[in-house]
């Protein structure tokens, strides 16, 4: 498996504390939301991201406002770290008029274009072709922005994800794929859905690098993501020049 070079992107003490703040906020929000669901006060379909906060923070921290994310259904924290307030997000989960979708939806289907957030789709993996389209737009418009596309290891077996990765590799798009491997896809263990050890092993076949990172190590996730983003921006600039 080709591996992404380990870049040392230095973080100040203040930045490390800020990352800790995001980790704690996202976990606390998720825990509170889970309680509200059990109490019957929030009736929307809520998919907990507890235990995956380091992936959200490590990948989103340091993104520019005009960089786009296409989050997974468990990635509520990406909305927070990208700039949506906790109050607005809670209003969204309550389907209130003050939420992102003005009461029309109580999940994460609403996007926030001005913050670089494309709303989640109900079909797992279907966000990746959209991400490829966004990345192609950035390339054609000669912008050095990047797109982050999130999906699970189960969705990695779908045609949508395969086509998006193949398209991104062929056209050298400024797109970073983030696979959140939590071992189980619904009730299906990973060893019964793929013959390889890591989803990242597939990257070489699409013509780009991949790396398997400890998703609970926020600094390792940050370093790997920043390295991938730096190369994606450089690729976009080279293609435009």
Where on the chain are the PLM-derived regions?
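Charged, compositionally biased N-terminal leader segments and the immediate start
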Residues: 1-16
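Generic recognition of stable, solvent-exposed alpha-helical segments in well-folded globular domains
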Residues: 18, 28, 163, 220-223
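N-terminal glycine-rich anion-binding loops that anchor highly charged ligand groups
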Residues: 21-37
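Cofactor-binding active-site loop characterized by glycine-rich and histidine/acidic residues
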Residues: 31, 35, 41-171, 189-195, ...
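Residue-level marker for buried hydrophobic side chains located in beta-strands
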Residues: 150, 177-178
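Loop/turn elements at helix/coil->beta-strand transitions in domains of secreted/extracellular proteins
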Residues: 173-174, 236
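Thiamine diphosphate
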Residues: 180-240
């Amino acid at each position: 498996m080709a591996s992404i070079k380990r870049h040392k992107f230095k973080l100040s003490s203040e930045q490390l504390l800020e990352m800790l703040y995001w980790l704690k906020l996202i976990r606390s929000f998720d825990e509170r939301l889970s309680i509200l669901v059990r109490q019957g006060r929030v009736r929307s379909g809520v998919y907990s991201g507890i235990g995956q906060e380091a992936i959200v923070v490590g990948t989103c921290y340091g993104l520019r406002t005009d960089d786009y994310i296409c989050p997974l259904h468990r990635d509520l924290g990406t909305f927070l770290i990208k700039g949506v307030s906790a109050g607005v997000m809670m209003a969204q989960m309550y389907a209130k008029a003050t939420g992102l979708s003005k009461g029309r939806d109580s999940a994460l289907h609403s996007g926030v274009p001005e913050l670089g957030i494309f709303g989640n789709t109900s079909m797992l993996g279907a966000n990746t072709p959209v991400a490829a389209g966004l990345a192609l737009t950035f390339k054609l418009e000669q912008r050095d922005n990047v797109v982050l596309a999130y999906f699970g290891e189960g969705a990695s077996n779908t045609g949508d994800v395969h086509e998006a990765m193949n398209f991104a590799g062929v056209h050298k798009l400024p797109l970073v794929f983030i696979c959140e491997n939590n071992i189980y896809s619904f009730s299906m263990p990973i060893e019964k859905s793929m013959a390889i050890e890591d989803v990242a092993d597939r990257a070489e076949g699409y013509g780009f690098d991949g790396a398997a990172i400890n998703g609970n190590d926020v600094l390792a996730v940050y370093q790997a993501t920043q390295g991938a983003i730096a190369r994606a921006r450089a690729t976009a600039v080279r293609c435009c020049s």
